[in-house]
């Protein structure tokens, strides 16, 4: 039995969000041991329980207040919301923040030998999908009628099996479509992972834990997006060098004991530092340039 006093977080047991969700929680300092066959894991150092379930079960667990938080793809969440609204419900939840992983798109794909002249080609066609409400929402806005073929997996085989004329499925790289003789023709929805919270007030202890977790998640994401830069730079070129570093804060500048014409610069850059940028820094006289990953950040 899960104790009500413990914060309950639902995440995907296996699939495209599972590994990165687990890594995010671990980087936030939550010590958990996940066993392959167990659906429930307990944090060792915080009053947190992790429920590992199918991704399409997570929105319902949050909306029905079975868990407090959920890490879920926006596409799965939106499909559940549309499903419940179609049934006359008014689902409520709180979006805590968008996360920096789980990027994908929901797209319509056709067999490679079929012509595509825009969405009107789908009029009265049979489309296989695991997201019937998102597909209907998109095509209804365009005034296009279609027949839905609901599949919960292996959607890409539907045209070859004679089940459908087209498919609407998640796409990351397009390799699966290509392997099944399909081509992507229309993006209908773009998605990332989100952290959501159930509707209603949490207990004071749970809310304090969520607040702490949000600060840590912010620090983890900022650290992943940032680099720590150190270099020796000529004093007369400081402004030029700083202008080459997009997203960089004003640097810490320290004198270099062995050379009064150079200073030591330390700074955090919130954007990717490419080789070309480092070469341009060197051309301006910078030396001993180091670009380091950041483990944690807190502002």
Swiss-Prot record:
Q: How is its activity regulated?
A: Feedback inhibited by histidine.
> What GO molecular function annotation could you give as one example from this UniProt entry?
ATP phosphoribosyltransferase activity
State any GO BP term from the record. L-histidine biosynthetic process
A Pfam family cross-referenced in the UniProt record is HisG_C
Superkingdom of this entry's organism?
Answer: Bacteria
Pathway recorded for this protein: Amino-acid biosynthesis; L-histidine biosynthesis; L-histidine from 5-phospho-alpha-D-ribose 1-diphosphate: step 1/9
Query: Which cofactors does this protein require?
Result: Mg(2+)
Is the keyword Repeat assigned to this protein? no
Q: What is its EC number?
A: 2.4.2.17
Gene3D superfamilies from the xrefs?
Answer: 3.30.70.120, Periplasmic binding protein-like II
Please give the catalytic activity noted in the UniProt record: 1-(5-phospho-beta-D-ribosyl)-ATP + diphosphate = 5-phospho-alpha-D-ribose 1-diphosphate + ATP
Q: Where in the cell is it found?
A: Cytoplasm
Principal location class: cytoplasm
Q: InterPro entries this protein is in?
A: ATP-PRT_HisG_long, ATP_PRibTrfase_cat, ATP_PRibTrfase_CS, ATP_PRibTrfase_HisG, HisG_C, N-reg_PII-like_a/b, N-reg_PII/ATP_PRibTrfase_C
Q: Which GO terms describe its cellular component?
A: cytoplasm
NCBIfam families recorded:
hisG, HisG_C-term
Q: Give the protein family.
A: Belongs to the ATP phosphoribosyltransferase family. Long subfamily.
Q: What does this protein do?
A: Catalyzes the condensation of ATP and 5-phosphoribose 1-diphosphate to form N'-(5'-phosphoribosyl)-ATP (PR-ATP). Has a crucial role in the pathway because the rate of histidine biosynthesis seems to be controlled primarily by regulation of HisG enzymatic activity.
Descriptive protein name: ATP phosphoribosyltransferase
User: From which organism does this entry originate?
Assistant: Baumannia cicadellinicola subsp. Homalodisca coagulata
């Amino acid at each position: 039995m899960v104790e009500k006093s413990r914060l309950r977080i639902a995440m995907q047991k296996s699939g495209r969000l599972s590994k990165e969700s687990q890594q995010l929680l671990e980087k936030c300092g939550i010590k958990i041991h996940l066993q392959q066959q167990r659906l429930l894991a307990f944090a060792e150092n915080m009053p947190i329980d992790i429920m590992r379930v199918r991704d399409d079960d997570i929105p319902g667990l949050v909306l029905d207040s079975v868990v407090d938080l959920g890490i879920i793809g926006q596409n799965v969440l939106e499909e559940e919301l549309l499903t419940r609204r179609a049934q006359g419900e008014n689902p409520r939840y709180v979006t805590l923040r968008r996360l920096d992983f789980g990027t994908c798109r929901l797209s319509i794909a056709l067999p490679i030998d079929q012509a595509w002249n825009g969405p009107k080609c789908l009029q009265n066609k049979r489309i296989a999908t695991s997201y019937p409400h998102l597909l209907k929402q998109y095509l209804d806005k365009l005034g296009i009628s279609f027949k839905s073929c609901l599949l919960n997996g292996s959607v890409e085989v539907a045209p070859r099996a004679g089940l459908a004329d087209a498919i609407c499925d998640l796409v990351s790289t397009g390799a699966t479509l290509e392997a099944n003789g399909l081509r992507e023709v229309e993006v209908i929805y773009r998605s990332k992972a989100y952290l959501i919270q159930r509707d209603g007030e949490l207990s004071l202890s749970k809310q304090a834990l969520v607040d702490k977790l949000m600060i840590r998640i912010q620090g983890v994401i900022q650290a992943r997006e940032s680099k720590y830069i150190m270099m020796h730079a000529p004093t007369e070129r400081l402004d030029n060098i700083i202008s080459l570093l997009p997203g960089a804060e004003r640097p810490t500048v320290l004198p270099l004991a062995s050379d009064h014409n150079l200073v030591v610069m330390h700074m955090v850059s919130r954007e990717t530092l490419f080789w070309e940028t480092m070469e341009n820094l060197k051309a301006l006289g910078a030396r001993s340039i180091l670009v380091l990953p950041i483990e944690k950040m807190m502002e």
